[in-house]
Swiss-Prot record:
Its EC number is 3.5.4.16. The gene is folE1. Signal peptide: none annotated. GO terms for molecular function: GTP binding; GTP cyclohydrolase I activity; zinc ion binding. One of its GO terms (cellular component) is cytoplasm. This is GTP cyclohydrolase 1 1. It comes from the Bacteria. PROSITE patterns: GTP_CYCLOHYDROL_1_1 (PS00859), GTP_CYCLOHYDROL_1_2 (PS00860). It catalyses: GTP + H2O = 7,8-dihydroneopterin 3'-triphosphate + formate + H(+). Homomer. It comes from Pseudomonas aeruginosa (strain ATCC 15692 / DSM 22644 / CIP 104116 / JCM 14847 / LMG 12228 / 1C / PRS 101 / PAO1). Disulfide bonds: none annotated.
Length: 186
């Protein structure tokens, strides 16, 4: 745990008018610092470590989809959570990625201070980089606490972002197949 980070949380409590020496807050700066480090541990990870060689030769050239990957991240503007799910697809060209690695790639980028638009693109580009896929598609749907708990306070709004690369961008048929399979096409 980073002692400087803990001290900053103590200063935040004082700045809010709280007494960091009161019983309920004695360990709060340390706990908050530890929680923030956990929530942002994606900074300490690399794509190479995450994939860890889990690329496998395959003749499959049909769409691979991992949908409903739960995620949470922290909005870089307010440090408040956004929570949702990612749907990731790619079209292999000779190799497939270990199934859990797709979710780990999502988590690596989500565990950073982030905006959803950038998160979506980072995931898509990472999957393309690792797999050399003919196409990659990522859709993220999430609820943002910065919009629910402050500002306009809209409790039921969701944000959808998508990035389509390669075949998913070039072929409406491929894109529509993906959207239909994740339940986002009529």
């Amino acid at each position: 745990m980073n002692p400087a980070l803990s001290q900053h949380y103590r200063e935040i409590l004082v700045g809010l008018g709280e007494d960091p020496q009161r019983e309920g807050l004695l360990d709060t700066p340390k706990r908050a610092a530890k929680a923030m480090q956990y929530l942002c541990h994606g900074y300490g990870q690399t794509l190479e470590e995450i994939v860890n060689g889990a690329l496998f030769a395959s003749d499959n050239d049909e769409m691979v989809i991992v949908r409903d990957i739960e995620l949470y991240s922290l909005c870089e503007h307010h440090l408040l959570p956004f929570i949702g799910k990612a749907h990731v697809a790619y079209i292999p060209t000779g190799k497939v990625l270990g199934l859990s690695k797709v979710a780990r790639i999502v988590d690596m980028f989500a565990r950073r201070l982030q905006i959803q638009e950038n998160l979506t693109r980072q995931i898509a580009e990472a999957v393309r980089q690792v797999t050399s896929a003919a196409g990659v598609a990522v859709v993220i749907e999430a609820q943002h606490m910065c919009m629910m708990m402050r500002g306009v306070e809209k409790q039921n709004s969701q944000m959808f972002t998508s990035v389509m690369l390669g075949a998913f961008r070039d072929s409406n048929t491929t894109r529509q197949e993906f959207l239909q399979l994740i339940g986002r096409s009529k």
